[in-house]
Amino acid sequence: VGFKAGVKDYRLTYYTPEYKTKDTDILAAFRMTPQPGVPAEEAGAAVAAESSTGTWTTVWTDGLTSLDRYKGRCYDIEPVAGEENQYIAYVAYPLDLFEEGSVTNMLTSIVGNVFGXKAXRALRLEDLRILPAYSKTFIGPPHGIQVERDKLNKYGRPLLGCTIKPKLGLCAKNYGRAVYECLRGGLDFTKDDENVNSQPSMRWRDRFLFVAEALFKAQAETGEVKGHYLNATAGTCEEMIKRATFARELGAPIVMHDYLTGGFTANTSLAFYCRDNGLLLHIHRAMHAVIDRQRNHGMHLRVLAKALRMSGGDHIHAGTVVGKLEGEREVTLGFVDLLRDDYIEKDRSRGIYFTQDWVSMPGVLPVASGGIHVWHMPALTEIFGDDSVLQFGGGTLGHPWGNAPGAVANRVALEACVQARNEGRDLAREGNEIIREASK
C-alpha cells in the first residue's frame, strides 16, 4: 500500500535549502529560538509546516492533494549575530494558501497557530514580502497621502495634531471647547483618544455634535480646513458603521479606528465605507505593544504596518524616534518608508528583510506621537519629512497659557523649522536656535 503512517521529522518535507523562491510566493522572515536539543533546521521546518499544510503526523489525505504545490518551505536559515541560539528562518508560502483581499486570513495562516509549536521556544515574525499579485486584491488606504493633501489644501509641511486630554471625564460640551481652542490656535487636527468610544460621561453622539460645531467655528475663523479624528470604534461592526455614517452626515472630514482591538475584518469594512463616502481614516495602534514589544517573540510593528496598509487606513501611529538609540531610528524610518513609498529596497540595517513593491497602492501618513513637544520639532521635521502628522498631546495642552497658545506655539515652531529647512539650514545643529528665534 502507498500510504505509510507515522510521525516523521518536519525537516524531511519542509526544509528545502535548494528551493528557489518564486515571484508568486509570499515570503516571511521569522526570528526563532529553538528549544534546547532541537536543530535549527527542524525548528524552521516546523514553522513552515504548521503555518501551511502540515500537522504533527502523516495523514492519508495528504495523498489526495499535491503537497509540493501547497506546502510552505523553509528555504534558508541564518544565525542572528550577537544572539545565542537565535536564527532567522526564511519561509516561502505559495499564493494559493491565502484568500484574496483578506488580511484576516493572511495573518491567521502565517501567525495563527505556529507560535505555540513545541519545537520553538520563542518566535517572532520580523517581515513579510507581499507580492503585487496579492496586494492588488486589497482595498489599501481609502484615499492616500496625495488625495488627503488635496482635500485639506495643505502642502509642503507636516500636518499637526493633538490628542484631547483628559481622555475620559470631560462632558461633551467641554470636550468640544478644548477641540475648538486647539484648532483655532493653528493645529490641523485634534484627536479622540483610543479608548474614547461611548462612555457614560460622554456618549458618542453628543461628542460628535459638539466637535462638529467646534470644527466649523474654527474653520470659519481661520480660513483653513480642520479635522478631528472621531473615534468610530465600537462593540459591533454595525455600530461602528452607524457612527461613521453620523460623522459623514455632520460633514466631518475624518474618522478613526483602533485597528488591532477592533480587528482587521472590521477595519477593512470601515476602509471601504470611508472610500465610498469621502471620509479620511485615522488608525490608532492600541494593543500593538502586546504583540511587538518583546524582541524575540510576537510580530514586529513593520508587519502590523504592512497589514494595515493592505487593510486600509490613511494615518497610522508610528512611534517618535526622538531620543531613542540610533539603530532604533533607522529601523523606525525603515517601516515609515514601508508605509509611504511605492517601492522599498531590502536593507537589513533598517530592518527591511525583503524588497517590497506596493505598485500603485496609496501611501499611509505616519503619525509621530507620544511624549513630544516644541523642542523636538526640528528633529521631527528632519526625520519624518513633510509626509507625516506630528501629534502633540501634553505638548499642546500643557502650555501654561492654555490650549490655543499651546497650538500657536506648535504651529509657529513647525513653520519656522520648515522655512529653515527650505533655506538650507541644518536642523540637527541649529534646531534650538531656530526655535528660540521663532518664539520671540
UniProtKB/Swiss-Prot annotation:
Principal location class: plastid
Reaction(s) catalysed by this chain's protein: 2 (2R)-3-phosphoglycerate + 2 H(+) = D-ribulose 1,5-bisphosphate + CO2 + H2O; D-ribulose 1,5-bisphosphate + O2 = 2-phosphoglycolate + (2R)-3-phosphoglycerate + 2 H(+)
EC numbers, comma separated: 4.1.1.39
Subcellular location, record wording: Plastid, Chloroplast
InterPro entries in alphabetical order: RuBisCO (IPR033966), RuBisCo_large_chain_AS (IPR020878), RuBisCO_lsu_C (IPR000685), RuBisCO_lsu_C_sf (IPR036376), RuBisCO_lsu_fd_N (IPR017443), RuBisCO_lsu_N_sf (IPR036422), RuBisCO_lsuI (IPR020888)
Modified residues (N6-carboxylysine): 191
GO cellular component: chloroplast
Residues holding substrate: 113, 163, 167, 285, 317, 369
PTM sites of type N6,N6,N6-trimethyllysine: 4
Keyword Chloroplast applies: yes
Gene3D superfamilies: Ribulose bisphosphate carboxylase, large subunit, C-terminal domain, RuBisCO large subunit, N-terminal domain
GO molecular function: magnesium ion binding; monooxygenase activity; ribulose-bisphosphate carboxylase activity
Active site: 165 (proton acceptor), 284 (proton acceptor)
Family membership noted in the UniProt record: Belongs to the RuBisCO large chain family. Type I subfamily.
Misc. comment: The basic functional RuBisCO is composed of a large chain homodimer in a 'head-to-tail' conformation. In form I RuBisCO this homodimer is arranged in a barrel-like tetramer with the small subunits forming a tetrameric 'cap' on each end of the 'barrel'.
Record's protein name: Ribulose bisphosphate carboxylase large chain
Organism whose genome encodes this protein: Pteris vittata (Chinese ladder brake)
Lineage of producing organism: Eukaryota, Viridiplantae, Streptophyta, Embryophyta, Tracheophyta
Gene that this polypeptide is encoded by: rbcL
